[in-house]
Amino acid sequence: MKKEIYSYNSESLTCNARPILPIMGEFHFSRYPEGEWKTAIKNMQQGGVDIVATYVFWIHHEEAEGEWDFSGRRNLKAFLSCCQEAGMKVWLRIGPWAHGECRNGGFPDWLVEKEKRGKLSLRTDDPQYLKYVDLFFTKIAEQADGYMHKDDGPVIGIQIENEYGHAGGPSDREEGMAHMRTLRAMAEKKGLTAPYFSATGWGGAYVPENFLPVLGGYVDAPWANHTHELAASENFLFQPFHDDANIASDFAEGQSDFTFDTSKFSYLTAELGGGLQVTAHRRTYPYPEDIEAQTICMLGAGANLIGYYMYHGGVNPDGKYTTLQESKATGYANDLPVKSYDFQTCLRENGLPSESYYRLRKHHIFIKNTQELLAPAKVYLPDNISEPASAEDMETLRAAFRYNKTADCGFLFINNHQRKRKMTEKQITPEKPLQFTVTDVEGIQRQMIFDRIHVRTDAILVLPYNLPVVIRGEQFRLRETNASYLGCFGGTYYFYTDEKPEDIYFEWSDGNDHAEAVRILTIHDAEHFCYAQEGADEKGKVSLLPDLHFAEAGKVRIADAGQAVESIWNVYGQTEPNVYELTLEYEYHPADALSGDVWLALDFGTAHACIRTEN
């Protein structure tokens, strides 16, 4: 098998010199039972995720100085092995400071205590601090040995530090840049090398040369130090290279200057909120349409790495000496749940998919099917209508057009949703058209005009323009349609829409009707769409993921007062001697299920049990 060669240019990431647009989802291995990693990875892949990003929290592995723990759910080597077996790429976020709503941002208490006693200075080039970092990186390298990309392993990316220069770090820019370079050199010396080294770039964070800057955005700010409603977020506008000033506003509010040259990099994200983690004082709920709309606004504005934080929730591991969540008691701004890190995200802490999982999934299918056209496509904003006055503007159409000049085609992105607001319904007509002026491959300016689109309140549209198609061996162009594009599978072109059948139109370059090559799905079916192809010459099979159904179980009774069983889930350390029995009647078709589907869940606070499928 030919080794994949990963690189990047100012337009996109590349694999074997071809543009790619990966989907990356955050999942913390040490916050999830090791026996369920394979199921979690498989379900992430089913959702369209190509790369799993994960923190290595220092405190999870060295709570007491010199006492290292890479066993059980903390076993990084075993997790990387699961990823390799599943064909899932990995982006390791090795810190040494991570945040991630972890105690001390991931620093062990003993290390923090050394700074308090004046023994060292954290997050600097202080030799005493670097001595401990060197050992931490050594331990990570031992775990990752054989799993780096150079060894044909799954690790293709490494993130150094987190929010450095925004949430902590020196105010002196050169000093901060130097420290980032120091950490990278230390990691590489240990064998922690990868095609991509990244650094978070929002809020003025330090991004030296030879680092990829990654950005993010959240639909709300549970870390904000107040409980009043936020102003309408600009994350729901199409803004190329957008910097969400609300990220980490608990550390430094309002910083949004870049320390890197945006012309040298494509727009990459690592922290698009797949949900929101609750805090004690601010328990914000991420509506699924919020998550979908924000993602499409980033994609339409040119994002060429869609990275979610989090994509799969989890549970904080038990600490030997303390609990392991962020808290005010440790000097941080927020109190977080002691155990739950559910994040209200795509795959919840119990492994169940949420509505956001399905809403995003159809866009991931589209991205995978069109990435070679989409990734090099330049972003254009409308030139015949004004930009929205602000995110509170519910009247102005929000749209962006990504045009690939080499292929002479593009995709129109429209978002008519704003969190906790109601946007007006809109009509794009010949009297009120939508116009973009693009520059083609010959340097000539051309107008792209759309004039037959109905935009409902909360609508999110992804419409192809001049799309190259092959039907019965002949090449055509799909000039226009008002149905969102899912992709081409087995020679059939799939679209989805909630418009009435009589209102859907397709305009082909040859003027004919190619209905036999088109399938129009409901939005629901697009979200559940699956295509499996056994071989290159096979037609392939289309199927749908199952919906979640909730049914009331039978009455619970105590069947036996047996012997107590010790478990890590015992509440307050007390064993439970009762054995419970119930009857659950449910029609079950194994072929239709997600691996790891939960068919019965019992939740008693910090104790839980469940029955899962295995396929």
Question: Could you say what each language-model-derived stretch is?
Answer:
Residues 37-105, 109-110, 184-189:
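Aromatic-lined substrate-binding rim segments of carbohydrate-active enzymes
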Residues 118, 129-144, 151-156, 160, ...:
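Carbohydrate-binding surfaces of carbohydrate-active enzymes
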Residues 23-28, 55, 91-95, 159-161, ...:
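A cross-family glycoside hydrolase active-site/sugar-binding cleft signature
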Residues 29-35, 61-62, 66-73, 166-167, ...:
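Acidic-and-aromatic substrate-binding clefts and catalytic sites of carbohydrate-active enzymes
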